[in-house]
Amino acid sequence: MTFPFSGAAVKRMLVTGVVLPFGLLVAAGQAQADSQWGSGKNLYDKVCGHCHKPEVGVGPVLEGRGLPEAYIKDIVRNGFRAMPAFPASYVDDESLTQVAEYLSSLPAPAAQP
C-alpha cells in the first residue's frame, strides 16, 4: 500500500495544521501579556473611572488634563492622599502607558454652570 501524499504535501499539511495554529496561540498569549487590561479605555472604565469620571465626583477629573505618563505612573504606583497605590501585579506598566495615552486623547469635560 502506498501513502497518497508526497513529502511536500505532508510538510504543507503539518505546517498548516500544527505549526501555524501553535504560532498563532503563542502570539495571542504574547499580545495578552503585553497589556493585562487590553486597552487604556478598558482600564479607565473598569478601574480609574470609578473615582475619576466627571459624573462620579470622587477623585479629580483626569480627562483632558494632559497629565504626563510619568506622573500617572508615579501616582498609581505610590498612591496620593485618598488614592491607594496599585502594584504592578494589579496594573502593569504597559496598561498605565495605554491609559495615559487614552486620557490625553480625551477632551476636557464641559464646565458646569
UniProtKB/Swiss-Prot annotation:
Outcome of mutating D74A: In strain: NCIMB 9866
Annotated binding of heme c, by residue: C48, C51, H52, M83
Pfam families (alphabetical): Cytochrome_CBB3
Post-translational modification note: Binds 1 heme c group covalently per subunit.
Keyword hit for Kinase: no
Annotated signal peptide: 1-33
Entry keyword annotation includes Signal: yes
Keywords: Electron transport, Heme, Iron, Metal-binding, Plasmid, Signal, Transport
Molecular-function annotations in GO: electron transfer activity; heme binding; metal ion binding
InterPro entries named in the record: Cyt_c-like_dom (IPR009056), Cyt_c-like_dom_sf (IPR036909)
Top-rank taxon, per record: Bacteria
Membrane-spanning segments: none
UniProt pathway annotation: Aromatic compound metabolism; p-cresol degradation
Complex formation: Tetramer of two cytochrome subunits and two flavoprotein subunits.
Record function comment: This is the heme-containing component of the p-cresol methylhydroxylase. It accepts electrons from the flavoprotein subunit.
Protein name: 4-cresol dehydrogenase [hydroxylating] cytochrome c subunit
Source organism per UniProt: Pseudomonas putida
